[in-house]
Amino acid sequence: MEKFQGYSEFDGARQQSFLYPLFFREYIYVLAYDHGLNRLNRNRSIFLENADYDKKYSSLIVKRLILRMYEQNRLIIPTKDLNQNHFLGHISLFYYQMISVLFAVIVEIPFSLRLGSSFEGKQFKKSYNLQSIHSIFPFLEDKFSHFNYVLDVVIPYPIHLEILVQILRYRVKDASSLHFFRFCLYEYCNCKNFYIKKKSILNPRFFLFLYNSHVCEYESIFFFLRKRSSHLRSISYKVLFERILFYGKIQHFFKVFVNNFPAILGLLKDPFIHYVRYHGRSILATKDTPLLMNKWKYYFVNLWQCYFSVWFQSQKVNINQLSKDNLEFLGYLSSLRLNPLVVRSQMLENAFLIHNVRIKLDSIIPMSSIIGSLAKDKFCNVLGHPISKAIWTDSSDSDILNRFVRICRNISHYYSGSSQKKNLYRIKYILRLCCVKTLARKHKSTVRAFLKRLGSGLLEEFLTGEDQVLSLIFPRSYYASKRLYRVRIWYLDILYLNDLVNHE
């Protein structure tokens, strides 16, 4: 980013908050191309000339696109021409895909500069443990025992393109860029309706930015109203406040009214509320009564329908009681389990029993989802019976064994915090037997004959690595006992979900 800040055009555009001139600068296309090569999934960038050609940047394609943008009439193709000239439609769709890639890069520039300036002069201590996914579960163990309800809200998608344009208008002040974005978005969808394919080249970065902008707008309003929820008692709203003047009206919040929002919001101040967004869902955990949870549900329905103009059904908001229902979160099924505890107390000559109930977070492995993921990747059938991995039989024995051991260790580490180890052992059994069947199929032998020839030492690789790690953590006496296999262990070095865990 520092490399391109030296250009005078970029500095002038940054000072005036103008992004539109950047669409006509070739170095921005180089930046987008370079980012496309460095993506994690290593997909082919659309700035390449073709799939078979060496990965070189095509300046000719960029020059043609810039010339077309200088004459925007050449970018407009009537529907009649799309039906008559298919080649023309494919070319236009290709150009609009290029613009979407470029727009995703350009529109993130002011956000990155604003974020970098906010961190200037500040020192932050890096804590790598907090980056781990497993660091969330100890927090849940401490906090969820005090909660009783979870509100699970499915975030709806905007049904009209103009909603996305209006949301982006609050964050990008350049009118020319917004008009150009609206024009390209409509033309792109027009061409896509005629020529889109199931496996066509899309730009996930661009659509992810639009989706995050849509969700960020929703969350900013929700968080503000959440902090001011004590002021919302018995207030009926009439006029929708403009988002552009949103921050200016904070001090005059009592005068703000909402259009077509006649509901009386009696939301109470609750300091024990926690919010998280996961897999397109908003999860709200709190210690409220059923009446207040229904009010929150009614609030979400009206917020989406009245403010975002999205038809939102109340069935998409589920109120789950943690003591009865399971919460699917980060590959686990979490719920609250009541453990009765009896304590015998004796005072002088009198003895009596004290019955206590201990609330504990119960984390369970979703076996149906894991078996479905294993069956999808051909490790077993839909019933969970192991089968051979035929596609791996061309590899060497050591390569096949290392693949299965790596998958087994990753799943074992991720689900080491499960309160029911029996399901984890079943997953290990499926992978081990699948490994043996794959090796037996490669050597054209039966499983029994293959194990009889090589012995049981073949499967020791599945246990060696995990045993070494646990022996360093726990004392030898505790490690030798069977209690180790009943405790939950959270690893603080897991930074991403495994593909089998992230089955959605």
Swiss-Prot record:
- List the GO terms this entry assigns under cellular component, sorted alphabetically: chloroplast
Is Lyase one of the keywords?
no
Protein's name in the database: Maturase K
Q: Which Pfam families has this protein been placed in?
A: Intron_maturas2 (PF01348), MatK_N (PF01824)
**Which family does the similarity line name?**
Belongs to the intron maturase 2 family. MatK subfamily.
Subcellular location, record wording: Plastid, Chloroplast
List the taxonomic lineage. Eukaryota, Viridiplantae, Streptophyta, Embryophyta, Tracheophyta
- State the UniProt keywords alphabetically: Chloroplast, mRNA processing, Plastid, RNA-binding, tRNA processing
> Which InterPro entries does the UniProt entry name for this protein?
Domain_X (IPR024937), Maturase_MatK (IPR002866), Maturase_MatK_N (IPR024942)
Keyword Transferase found: no
User: In the UniProt record, what gene is named as encoding this protein?
Assistant: matK
Q: Show the PANTHER family listed in the entry.
A: MATURASE K (PTHR34811:SF1)
Question: Which function does this protein serve?
Answer: Usually encoded in the trnK tRNA gene intron. Probably assists in splicing its own and other chloroplast group II introns.
Q: Name one GO biological process term.
A: RNA splicing
Molecular function (GO) terms for this protein are: RNA binding
